[in-house]
Structure formats: C-alpha cells, structure tokens
C-alpha cells in the first residue's frame, strides 16, 4: 500500500520535533523514454532500515540517484534531514554528499590505495585531521572485520572483502543516512549475509539505512520495512515486510483442494470456500 500525503502529515504531527531523515513529497522524474518515478510520496524516519524492492526499471535506482543529487526531479519536493535538496546548488553538492554514506554494487574502490587508505580517504576529503584519521580508521576496520587486511590492495581482496571496504568507507564519518544500491548483487549468498549483517549493525548505531535490492531471500529473512515500486510508482509500503506481497502460493492452494470437503453444517453461499481460503 503506497504512502499518501495524509500519511506523511500524520507522521509529522506525531513527531513534530523530529523531521524525517528522508522525505519524498509527490516526486516525479521523467526520462525521454518514460517515467522513472511517478508521484512518489514517502518518509523515512531516523534510525529506520528500509528496503526498496521492485523489478529492473521499477524506479529504485532513480530514488537513490535523486537522493544523492545525481538527478533532479521533474516535479515534487525531496528533503534530507529537513533540508530541501532543491536549495543545494551544484557547487555545494560535493559537500552535501560528504554527509551521506553510499555503497555501490561495484565497490568503486581506489585501485592504487590500500584498504586503510581507501577508508582514510573518506575522512581526508572532509578535512579530518591526521589524529582523527588515526583514531577512526582502526575502529571502523574492526567493525567491518578488516583489521587483518588494512595493508592489502583491492585486487588482493575477495568480492565480499571489497564490499566491506566500501561499507567501511561509507560509514567512517558516521553519516545520518547510508544508501546501499544493490550491495549484494555481485556476491554469493553466504557473503551477502555477512554484508547485510554489517549494514544491520551500522543501523543499530542510529544511522538510517536504505537498501535497494533484488535479493528476495535477504529481504524475507530480515523482515524490515519494504517499499515496493513498479513502473515508477510506489505500490506497497509495509512494516516488517517480505520481498513480495504474500498471497497463498499455488502449492498451498493445491494442498487445500486435496483436503476432503467436510459435510456442510449450514446452507453455504456460493464462493464461501474461496473467501475462507484467502482470509488471513
């Protein structure tokens, strides 16, 4: 079920002093070949963990690119931590992005720098002192299980280890918002579990985490909030949701049909059995 503008206003009224970390209000993005996002409205509160799900082309990546100001909306309002992104000039976009953590499917590591230096770079570009770098980098490497790899270069690491470096770099500044676009897309199931556990630990520190993913098993396992998109529209916004909205499966329905029908104890109306079969 999509979030309506009335839902947004109700949430704001319930928490008047805590603006949402992310707010989309009637946001649309039109491309030359169609709508990437169509009249989308939702909010994400401080400390939430949210999955964006949907098929390829559903609008997940458009949401992520809008959030980092890689794209501008055709219409509507986007706010991050209460700040209207339309007010951020192109010159100030790099400064805005430094307050976000972003994890990509393809890692985007600096190939000629070690694990330590890849993570330290995220601090250096924000003006952190050498003392801060020396204090923060070892801590984040311990959190991400990379303490023994700090002198390795990216080509000496497995895919899962490279993604851990990407997560460490995104989180070393302790951003209020971390965005992960298909973070397990190139990883095997066991490694994917490790990455999602890491993102969950980060979320437990208070950072809001939004993950765009096709990993249905992971979404079903974690049971966090799910926002589902289809053809640019939000079609479901569910707390503790599954990857796909769960109806009775074909197998379950087949089992139901194989059960012997009980003797009726009252006059049945047409369709009663089907009503009960699909009732929660």
What feature does the model see in each segment?
Residues 153-157, 161-163:
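Conserved ABC ATPase signature
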Residues 172-176:
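A short, proline-enriched helix->beta-strand linker immediately N-terminal to the Walker B motif
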Residues 178-181:
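Catalytic Walker B motif of ABC-type/P-loop ATPase nucleotide-binding domains
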Residues 76-84:
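Conserved ABC transporter NBD signature motif
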Residues 113-120:
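Short coil-to-helix segment of the ABC ATPase nucleotide-binding domain corresponding to the Q-loop/switch region
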Residues 85-101, 130, 202-204, 246-249:
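ABC ATPase NBD coupling module
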Residues 68:
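Helix-to-loop junction immediately C-terminal to a conserved catalytic motif
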